[in-house]
Amino acid sequence: MTATLTSLNFEHLIVTDPKILADIRNVYATTHYGPEDAEFLKTPGGQQDLDFNTFIRYNQSVRNGLPWVQRVFDMTGKTLIEIGCGTGSSTAAFAYLAKHIYSCDPKENTLPTARARLEALNLTNIDITSHAAPEFFHYCRQNYCDQADAVLFFAVLEHQTLDERIESLRQAWQILKPGGVIIVIETPSRLTYMDHHTTRLPFYSMLPMDVALRYVEHSSRGDFVGSMLKARSEPLAVQEELMIRWGRGISYHEFDLAFPDGGYTIIADGYEREMTDLFPVTFDERLLQGFVAHNGFNIPPAFLRHTLCLILRKGDGAVPAPQRTYTPHVATKLELERLRDRLDLMSIAEIRGELNRLMDRGVAFGHQSGM
């Protein structure tokens, strides 16, 4: 049953008790970081990380994640498997609705924070273990449940290898009950001009791995650059895995590989209000939509967002799953032509403005000044 709109306000779940927040923050600071990180934690970047893992992501899960899912799939009383719980922000949020959550994370240093959060909020309907996917699905079958109503990947798929990613999606599909859902939240797309997730560099998501490894110094993220440079003397396979663990964008290709026969329906595609509030639609996305529409590619709009937030529903035999089709925002040829004209004018204006700015700064084109 889909939730009614009146049930989509979860503001009462926001944690404001300063003692609870301080306790969670302290556990995270002392278990995720060591004494050598004391100075970093005093910096704006360190404080931001503490805030993010104490309350920001939890608040986002409550205000955006819960109503977004509940709008199309009622989680009340359902069994949820969560892959990659991290510090338990999404775990705690969804625990208010689900009957039981079976959750895992391969990073043991994140689990004390998750457990402290759940204890502080008096949430007892969760089992957390230190496992990686896809192995966790086998563990669930042996120890917890044969089937689940939903599987959650919250900011997880981008940190997996290709094999892990495809097998995790397949295992999730197999353990789902008919009519169950796979929930993907906050996973960066590789089909973007800008890598906002890992390097904050343009076109980085499009680079092949060998070029990406050589180009890390250009990133403005000191922690990322330092980590990657430290591994420069390691075998190439070690460097590649480290890059993946930091996060590499994904696309519809992995879903086509995991589900070659289709069989699913996209019941939420990331253009809903809850997700656009978190991740506003960008000019780059509109360009990609226009490109797909112009060429008639059969790519669902869910995979054209710069940050993927989508819910896949497994067929239950009641209604045949429709073929995956792309319904362009531009419905007619005339509208497409008008969109093209607007994009051309916008692009020309932006390019002209940038050229003027560069010329005002005395930037030479094609060669260095004085050469």
Language-model features: locations:
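Conserved N-terminal segment of class I S-adenosyl-L-methionine
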Residues: T2-D146, A150, F154, I166, ...
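Short catalytic/ligand-binding loop motif for oxyanion handling, primarily in non-cytosolic enzymes
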Residues: S89-A93, T110, Q160, R190-D195, ...
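Short conserved AdoMet
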Residues: A95-Y96, K177, P260
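Short catalytic micro-motifs in class I SAM-dependent methyltransferases
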Residues: A155-H159
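A short glycine-rich, Lys/Arg-flanked "PGG" loop and its adjoining helix->strand segment in the class I
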Residues: I166-P178
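Conserved class I S-adenosyl-L-methionine
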Residues: I183-A212
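SAM-dependent methyltransferase
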Residues: L201-H253
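A C-terminal cap/extension of S-adenosyl-L-methionine-dependent methyltransferases
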Residues: A231-N356, D360
